[in-house]
């Protein structure tokens, strides 16, 4: 079973995302509430995909992404950004090579499709 790590500080949004993805796809979603916990969780669970909220307390999603890309063992982890600031995320995507960006609010079916597509791309590369 595929594993996804969700970094989202809003508990209602996190619950909605986790429920929507696990109901629609054969995946397990692990959740952390802030950017500082992401790296430890990645090392502990080895997710197939990381979903990052851009605006989190402590380390924001862009900071976390920068740390991921700076670590040789984590550089290839695919990342999906969720943001209420799509222009900022698109700029970061172009600058840092972010795998994908999705604007909030989003449709749960569209999110599940995007996650499924990204996981399929990862499977083809592996």
PLM features: what roles do these ranges have?
Residues 56:
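Receiver (REC) domain active-site loop signature in two-component systems and cognate sites
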Residues 106-117:
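C-terminal output helix
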Residues 11-30:
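Two-component/phosphorelay signaling modules centered on CheY-like receiver
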Residues 18, 63, 85-102, 113:
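Alpha4 helix (beta4-alpha4-beta5 surface) of REC/receiver domains from two-component response regulators
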Residues 8:
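Conserved acidic carboxylate
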Residues 34, 60-66:
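Acidic catalytic/metal-coordinating carboxylates
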């Amino acid at each position: 079973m595929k594993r996804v790590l969700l970094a989202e500080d809003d508990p209602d949004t996190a619950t909605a995302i986790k429920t929507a993805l696990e109901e629609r796809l054969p995946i397990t979603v692990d959740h952390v509430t802030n950017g500082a916990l992401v790296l430890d969780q990645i090392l502990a669970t080895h997710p197939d995909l990381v979903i990052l909220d851009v605006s989190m307390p402590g380390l924001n999603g862009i900071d976390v992404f920068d740390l991921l890309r700076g670590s040789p063992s984590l550089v290839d982890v695919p990342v999906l950004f969720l943001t209420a600031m799509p222009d900022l995320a698109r700029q970061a995507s172009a600058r840092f090579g972010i795998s994908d960006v999705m604007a909030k609010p989003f449709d749960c079916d569209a999110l599940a499709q995007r996650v499924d597509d990204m996981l399929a791309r990862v499977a083809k590369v592996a």
